[in-house]
Amino acid sequence: LWMPDGETLVIANGGIRTEADSREMMNLDAMEPSLVLLRRDGTLVSKEQLPERMNSVRHLAVAADGTVVSGQQYEGDPLDHAPLVAIKRPGQAFQPFPLGEDVRQTMRQYTASLAIHDELRLLAVTAPRGNSVFFWDLDSATLRQQVHLPDCAGVAAVADGFVVSSGQGRCRLFDCRGERIAAEPLALPAGLWDNHLRLA
């Protein structure tokens, strides 16, 4: 994704080499996931890693102020305490976002997607293994709400909040303007859905 300056690319390096046909992960013992900032001319600005080597940096969202948030998928022991969401605020290091242990356990070592709502200063993260979507205040890192949605995956910011899709063909609009986040179903054309979401 491009940073707000239009000159810097932010890259999530998952660190996993996958065999093309079988999709088998080939290098779990030598993973080096990272968050990279790269200038348009190819100059490396920064390369930062989280402490857990098997924590694959997979998904990114960038706020208008240059805050970068990443979602991880942990390939190690299911009982390990890996940071599944991380944040890089302008001028600061790439570091774990404070989830809370109950949230981390609900995620079951896997995030699918995330999005930032710049006007409302909210972060939305989907966790399909935990059948949950989470909404945080981006500035205070306070959890606003957790909502049950089976196999939720895609998420995108819209005027009033977020749209979230699922691998089961469900789609919800979450209105985040009030104190409580309200959800309403959205109708999708038959057969036109996916685990990823981009709104135009």
How would you describe each model-predicted region?
Residues 11, 69-71, 125, 164-165:
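Residue position within the beta-strands of beta-propeller blades
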Residues 11-31, 71-82:
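Short, conserved, GDST-rich strand-edge loop motifs in beta-rich repeat architectures
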Residues 31, 55-58, 81, 110, ...:
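Beta-rich catalytic cores
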Residues 48-53, 98-108, 145-150, 185-188:
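Surface loop/turn motifs at the tips and blade-to-blade linkers of beta-strand repeat domains
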Residues 7, 65-67, 119-121, 159-161:
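Short coil/turn segments that connect the beta-strands within blades of beta-propeller domains
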Residues 25-42, 82-91:
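Beta-propeller blade signature
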Residues 39-42, 89-92, 138-141, 176-178:
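Short loop/turn segments that connect beta-strands within beta-propeller blades
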